[in-house]
Amino acid sequence: MKKTVLAAGIALVLSFPSMAAEPSTLTDRADRLDEVVYGSIQNGSFLERIDSLDTEINGSTDEKATEGQGLDTRIDRLYNEVIRSDNDSQPSLDTRVNTLEYYLTDKIKQDPLSSRVDTLDSTVFGKEQTGGLASRVTALEKAVYGDNHYELTTVTLPENTVFKISLNDEVSSKTNQVGDPVHFTVAEDVTVDNVLVLPRGAQGSGVITKVNGPKFFGRSGSLEISFDQVISIDEDTIPTVL
C-alpha cells in the first residue's frame, strides 16, 4: 500500500516511517497488546498477562485450543487478531472498532480498546454487553451494518496530498527542547476515490528538531518540528514530511 501525504494547516508532507516501529520481540508485542486493549502495560507474569488478554478478547482461555502452543504462537495470534491482521477480508479488531466509531460519530477515539467497545455498546444497545471483545464487536457490526459487508481496499495515496492538522499540545520555544515529541490530530477526512484513508481524528507524531529561545527587546523565539508519521484507519503507518 503506497501512501504519501502533504499536511497543511501546519502544512506537512507525509511520506511516513512507522509511527511506532512494528514490535519485534515477544515482550514488545505483549506490551503493545496491553496498551491497545487496556491503555497501559499490565502487571503479572507473562503467562498471566497472555491468559488475561485471551479472555478479554475471546471470552475465555481455551486450554485445549492453546495446548501445545508456545508463547510466541499465542502472542502472534492475538497480535494479528487485535492489531495487525494480514487478511483484508477480516481486519483487526482495532481497525473494525475504528470503522464503527467513524461510521457512528465521524471521528475515531484514542482510548483503550476495551473502553471504546464499552462506549459503542452503550451507544448502540443502551448498555455494555458481556463476552469477549471479538464477539461484542461482531454483534455491533451486525446491529450497525446489517447485511452490508465492508472490506479493506488497497489504494495509492497521491504524492503531495494536502490536509489540515491540529497540535494536541501547546509547544513553545520557552519551554520545549530539541527531541521533545509532538503529537497531532488530523482535522479532516482524507479520501482517495471515495475510500477513506485518514479519518478525522487520526493521530500522528513528530519531534522538535530546533529551538531558538526568545530574544531581547521583545523578539519572539522559534522552533522547528519534524512531523514524521500518521496512522491510517487500518493502523498502517504513513510517513510525513514538513
Residue ranges and their predicted role:
Residues 151-242:
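Contiguous beta-sheet cores, especially beta-hairpins with glycine/small-residue-rich turns
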Residues 21-142:
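Alpha-helical, heptad-rich or low-complexity scaffold/stalk segments
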Residues 106-108, 145, 165-167:
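Mature soluble domains of exported/periplasmic/lumenal proteins and thiol-rich metal-chelating peptides
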